[in-house]
Amino acid sequence: MGKNVVVLGTQWGDEGKGKIVDLLTQDAQVVVRYQGGHNAGHTLKINGVKTVLRLIPSGMLRPNVTCYIANGVVLSPQALLSEIKELEGNGVNVRERLRISLACPLILPYHIALDKARETHMGKSAIGTTGRGIGPAYEDKVARRALRVGDLFHRDRFANKLTELLDYHNFVLTQYFKQPAVDLESLLDESLQWAEELRPMVCDVSACLHEHRKQGENILFEGAQGVYLDIDHGTYPYVTSSNTCVGSVINGAGFGPRYIDYVLGITKAYTTRVGGGPFPTELLDDVGKRIAERGQEFGAVTGRPRRCGWFDAVLLKRSIELNSISGLCVTKLDVLDGLEVLRIAVAYKDRDGNILSRPPLAADDFDDLLPVYEELPGWQESTADVTVMSDLPANARAYLKRIEEILGIPIDLLSTGPERDSTITLRGPFL
């Protein structure tokens, strides 16, 4: 009997999901992306070679794994084909093992133009999007006007829908944002090439997944971004445009909730965030700079520097509740090597001195909150590339044990470096 495992980020993304998904695919036959778009970069480092995947599931680097892009993903044909060719240039056989949902909404050039125009227009109030058209594409989906992958294979239907849709979006671009219009004819010509290249890879992903399930194969669902970027449960409005919580597997891949066996939450041993929005434990001092430098905290897709701070157990507790997380994987423990003191936020305090054990639901409500910290001693020894728990420094083990105690959940995996083998496995999700 196969097992179905979900891997998702418990913070603001960039937790190291790509490496862990790649590691776990040694026990999986299928890997599925079920939400987000090419705004998420999953970084893998195998035998010293770094690979950044944006749309294609991280299981693609395992030759016997079938990968799916499900209907919850907004798909840029241009970005996908570019990524396929990049991997093929490195000797990876992509097209025979990648399948794409006919129901994926398309990201087209006008979505990107709208995204960039809006961010420029908002100035200092900008959300800090990646400018890749993700939000506008999801807007079209919710407004029931999106073009989907399946439309590409019906030329007249696609042209009629695109003409009407482009008329609307070009009006907004030119009249409101004062930006150039997107050309219809060139987009139609480009779409012909997309259709030809994508046709062999499309399918009904939900139906395929249930066939894999019935055959007893292990399926791994790979989340993008993190819980606090969720459009409903994140630090709204500083969020992404999709649901990043575990429930997105159900809608975004057409996979029933009772079939999910295990949810693995990925968290860094500290906290990071990209772009604007609240960040209670953010460090603006030399410690924050040191963590950023040691952790090489720059966005895999955008290259933007990440904000760094202490581990926030208040946020993690809510992540665990929202996603019924079975166990945690703590990443980048080695980044904390050499620090004299470590801090864990165990609560927040408002301006009146009231102690809050849960994060607020709106971004503005974080403004007057300060973290309440618990201090623990650091360690001077290196934890890099350690693969046995007992070989970790005593204070590192104590730090991890305290996280388990505060959160009430086990740490099942521990990452001590970017390579596949730099991992401590305490309990495997597929066991």
Swiss-Prot record:
PANTHER family: ADENYLOSUCCINATE SYNTHETASE. GO terms for cellular component: cytoplasm. GO terms for molecular function: adenylosuccinate synthase activity; GTP binding; magnesium ion binding. It catalyses: IMP + L-aspartate + GTP = N(6)-(1,2-dicarboxyethyl)-AMP + GDP + phosphate + 2 H(+). GTP binds at residues 13-19, 41-43, 306, 332-334, 415-417. IMP binds at residues 14-17, 39-42, 130, 144, 225, 240, 304. Binds 1 Mg(2+) ion per subunit. Keywords: Cytoplasm, GTP-binding, Ligase, Magnesium, Metal-binding, Nucleotide-binding, Purine biosynthesis. Mg(2+) binds at residues 14, 41. The active site is at 14 (proton acceptor), 42 (proton donor). One of its GO terms (biological process) is 'de novo' AMP biosynthetic process. The lineage of its organism: Bacteria, Pseudomonadati, Pseudomonadota, Gammaproteobacteria, Legionellales. Plays an important role in the de novo pathway of purine nucleotide biosynthesis. Catalyzes the first committed step in the biosynthesis of AMP from IMP. Belongs to the adenylosuccinate synthetase family. Homodimer. Its EC number is 6.3.4.4. It is found in: Cytoplasm. InterPro entries: Adenylosuccin_syn_GTP-bd, Adenylosuccin_syn_Lys_AS, Adenylosuccinate_synth_dom1, Adenylosuccinate_synth_dom2, Adenylosuccinate_synth_dom3, Adenylosuccinate_synthetase, P-loop_NTPase. Substrate binds at residues 300-306. This is Adenylosuccinate synthetase. Pathway: Purine metabolism; AMP biosynthesis via de novo pathway; AMP from IMP: step 1/2.
